[in-house]
Swiss-Prot record:
Protein's UniProt name: Small RNA degrading nuclease 5
GO molecular function, one term: exonuclease activity
Role: Probable 3'-5' exonuclease degrading single-stranded small RNAs.
Record gene name: SDN5
Keywords tagged on the record: Exonuclease, Hydrolase, Nuclease, Nucleus
Domain Exonuclease: 215-364
Disulfide-bond pairs as recorded: none
Listed SUPFAM superfamilies: Ribonuclease H-like
Subcellular location: Nucleus
Annotated organism of origin: Arabidopsis thaliana
Gene Ontology CC annotation, any one: nucleus
Length: 567
């Protein structure tokens, strides 16, 4: 059967769902249509496809609500599916599953081979994974009372060239004052501008009677020394695009890596450079005063490398909001291409701080000229997945800890708080057998809680890190894949397997069973990141610990999704 015929057949079947029959008798009606031997089946179009969390949510809304047909799986006889059970297993990444697939045999026996699932970054809160699955997002519909259409995006370099004009000309008849776009104290704290905790030199008030520049853009480049990244180039440009300052700086410590790919700095360029950090600070403070608005992209890094504090900042990484929220920031190169039709950071010789500073200034001026809504992603509305399913006439149950139940249950959901995996299994089995419940969510969290407890125990943490460093040192190719698993972890995996089997056994025929692991052991990732940040805590070679972190993070971000239909 061709994919187009499959789609038409599925759509026809979906239309039959809305014929006004009683929802509780829908299954019997469809068995009358398809015959007593009919069964729902899955056809994975591309088993090698890597899914994301939205794909998992999309599968649920396609089966139970008015979602879109997934591109990665075809469901034969979809109307025969009486319910969907979604089980969340945090902590189980692909590597752990593959190394203990025999212990976790029920997953394959129930659902077949898993598909790779790209987890969210380990940097974000673990709750974001659940939020991504249990919260549906859509663009807000425009209404008659909506504000005026935002200006079109710039399509050519000439159209966006705001440089060459004075501050007065550029700020004439603007929607909001320039100060509106500077970071608030809270925003500075949220984005790493923690000046008060460090010994930094503050910018000073302008001398009486002087005319300090109203707004300037800053960009710095760094090379790597034994102490990490250190300042090697400072560039300031004014509102007209003129370079006010552009100097190379000799780091305090010897350079170990010129970081040319990103910094654009080479050994030849640094020959004969005698300007010190103190020298460049003095020059900087003669151009940037307390009243000056400083523009840049992720300026907290530049100011920290300069060891200067300044509280009047327009940060284009914050100014242009990322579609996925505050935890993400769009790269300057992408913003320049999208809003300025300008290619930057393309040279093989590395970044150009003057080019980057001008791009940041142009982006800030565009926002100032057109207003705060310019360049903002479409307004998104968030609805609970369970509410979306309820609106489609489906009855839902959520079985989880009290915080998750309170946060994601809809007004019509059967909300069941539990405090252990055994209790979650018991309640889930009951709901699965309830013919009126068409969607059931639950999670088994013992493995993830075990990882959290282990990461919080200094002795266990240090022992595990020592083992990992040893593995990396002895066999770089094998990475951490052969790391030993403790008897306690094995026992938890065994119990997880038994619970999965018990839950599956309770499913009615043709029920869809989705098992999503979400992420691996992020607890140890967060702990190691903190150790590297608080250098006094490190009891290992820093370079080796960084390599361990890279391995841990890469492993934790490859999760799995199992999908099966009870036969």
């Amino acid at each position: 059967m061709s994919s187009s015929k499959r789609k038409r057949g599925a759509e026809t079947a979906a239309e039959d769902c809305d014929d006004g029959t009683d929802k509780s008798n829908t299954g019997n009606s469809f068995f009358d249509i398809y015959g007593p031997e009919a069964k729902a089946e899955l056809d994975f179009k591309s088993p090698e496809t890597t899914l994301n969390l939205q794909d998992v949510q999309g599968l649920v809304t396609w089966v139970l609500a008015e979602g879109f047909m997934p591109s990665w799986v075809f469901i034969k006889n979809k109307p025969l599916i009486p319910k969907v059970v979604l089980l969340y297993l945090p902590g189980l990444d692909a590597a752990l599953y593959l190394s203990h697939s025999k212990t976790l045999s029920s997953l394959k026996s129930c659902c077949g081979n898993p598909m790779a699932l790209l987890a969210l970054s380990c940097v974000v809160d673990e709750m974001r994974t659940i939020d991504t699955i249990l919260t549906c997002k859509g663009r807000k519909k425009k209404t008659v009372t909506s504000s005026v259409e935002p200006p079109p995006l710039v399509s050519s370099p000439e159209a966006c060239n705001l440089m060459g004009k004075s501050f007065v000309e550029l700020t004439k008849d603007i929607p909001f004052p320039v100060s509106y776009y500077t970071l608030s104290q809270k925003e500075m704290e949220q984005n790493g501008y923690t000046f008060e905790k460090l010994e930094l030199t503050p910018t000073l008030p302008a001398p009486s009677g002087s005319c300090p520049p109203e707004i300037v853009a800053l960009d710095c480049e760094m090379c790597i020394t034994k102490e990490g990244l250190e300042l090697t180039r400072v560039t300031l440009v004014d509102i007209q695009g003129q370079v006010l300052l552009d100097k190379l700086v000799m780091p305090t410590n010897p350079i170990t890596d010129y970081n040319t790919r990103y910094s654009g700095i080479t050994a030849v360029m640094m020959e004969g450079v005698t300007t010190t950090l103190k020298d460049i600070q003095e020059e900087f403070l003669k151009l940037v005063f307390k009243e000056t608005i400083l523009v840049g992209h992720s300026l907290e890094n530049d100011l920290l490398s300069l060891k200067i504090s300044h509280n009047l900042v327009i940060d284009t990484a914050v100014l242009y909001k990322h579609p996925h929220g505050r935890s993400y920031k769009t790269k300057l190169r992408i913003l320049a291409k999208k809003f300025l039709a300008r290619e930057i950071q393309e040279s093989e010789s590395g970044h150009d701080s003057a080019e980057d500073a001008k791009a940041a200034m142009d982006l800030a001026l565009l926002k100032i000229k057109h207003g705060p809504d310019f360049g903002s992603p479409p307004e998104v509305i968030r609805k609970k997945l369970l509410a979306v399913l309820n609106e489609s006439g489906k009855t839902t149950s959520i079985i989880d800890n009290i915080n998750i139940v309170k946060r994601y249950a809809s007004e019509s959901s059967n909300a069941i708080p539990v405090s252990s995996d055994d209790e979650a299994l018991s309640k889930a089995v009951k709901e699965v057998k309830n013919k009126r419940s068409q969607f059931v969510w639950t999670q088994f969290s013992e493995l993830n809680a075990h990882f959290q407890s282990r990461a919080d125990d200094p002795q266990k943490l240090n022992s595990r890190l020592a083992e990992m460093i040893s593995l990396l040192t002895c066999n770089k190719k094998s990475g951490l894949k052969k790391s030993n698993v403790s008897p306690e972890t094995k026992e938890i995996l065994k119990k997880m397997n038994e619970r999965v089997q018990s839950l599956y056994a309770a499913l009615p025929t043709n029920a869809m069973f989705i098992v999503c692991t979400g992420h691996g052991d992020t607890s140890i990732v967060h702990r190691v990141r903190k150790m590297l940040k608080d250098e006094d805590e490190i009891g290992f070679d820093r370079e080796k610990l960084v390599k361990v972190l890279e391995e841990l993070q890469a492993q934790a971000e490859v999760a799995l999704c199992f999908v099966g239909i009870k036969q």
